[in-house]
Amino acid sequence: MSCWASIDLGPESILFADDDLVAVDKAPGVLCDASIDPNREHLGTALRQWAQDDSAEFLPAHRLDRGTSGVVLFARNRPAATALMKQFQERTVSKHYQAVVHLPTDSAWTGGDTLERRSYLRHRKGMSEEVRSGGKPAHSGFEVLHIDGPLALMRASPKTGRTHQLRVHLAALDAPIVGDERYGHSPLT
């Protein structure tokens, strides 16, 4: 089975649209843009089909990993893209995710616990890693929402925007995301 989802932008996928902005509910397996593989369909091409305009611009204000689902904002013109990028750079926009994670061995975590992780991350060859020097600062906040046996539902809030930041930080806390083959344990059986 392919990990590439077909891109069907039905009415339920478009959460908001005006002349400057489109908010899209991205399914897992879908690329946000052509940066990874210019020959693969991505949300930008699907939005041009949705708009019925092959020359329309849809510029992602941020990205989600291919395997991640969630809301992605696209600017429909350069001035809107500039304004959105400024908001992300100045941190006037916040992002929050939910993830099911493996609990650390002998964890004393309970629902409502909050955790932070600060480190330096270096990204190369498709992987990010925590390093003592030579990386960029990364800061994440986490809240335990629910615990069920060996798993926990976490709210994850990146304070910086490093590649794979939340995945690396959760793995460093010995709480990798379930199903994360790159930074986590073996898949849940």
Report residues per predicted region:
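RNA pseudouridine synthases
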Residues: 1-189
